[in-house]
C-alpha cells in the first residue's frame, strides 16, 4: 500500500514537472516570426539612418524618408515631392528596374543571412506628395522565397 502511494505521488510530481517544463520551453523558444522581427528591428536601428542618408536622392524627384519594419520585411520609404500616378512611376522607373533591384538586393541578402530566414527582404515603398502609395517593390535575397510581384 505504501509503495502504491509513493508511486502515485512520484507520478503526480513527474506530471507537474513535465507540465512546468513544457510551459517553460514554450516560452523559451520564440517563433520564427518573432526571431525575424527581432533581427529586422535591430537591423533598422543600426542601419536605418545610414540607409536614409545613402538613398536620400537615389530616385529622381523622391526623397528617402523612412526605414521601418512591417510584417516580414524591412521597408524603405520614398516620398515624391509631387503627385505621381502608377503609370507615371512605371514610365520613369520600369526601364531601370533590374538595376534598382540589384542596388537593394545586398540589403535583403544581409538581412536574410543574419536571420537565417529566407522569406524576408526589403520592400521599396513609394508615396506621392500626399502620402498615397504609388508603388511597392518587394526585393528578396538571392535565395529568397519572397514573392516578387510587380503587378498592382
Label every model-predicted segment.
Residues 2-11:
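Bacterial N-terminal signal peptides that target proteins for export
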Residues 15-19:
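Hydrophobic core
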Residues 21-24:
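C-terminal motif of bacterial Sec signal peptides marking the signal peptidase cleavage site
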Residues 26-28:
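Bacterial signal peptide processing site
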Residues 31-46, 88-99:
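Alpha-helix boundary/N-cap detector
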Residues 37, 41, 45, 49, ...:
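Polar/charged, Gly/Pro-rich intrinsically disordered segments
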Residues 52, 86-115:
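Short, non-transmembrane amphipathic alpha-helical segments
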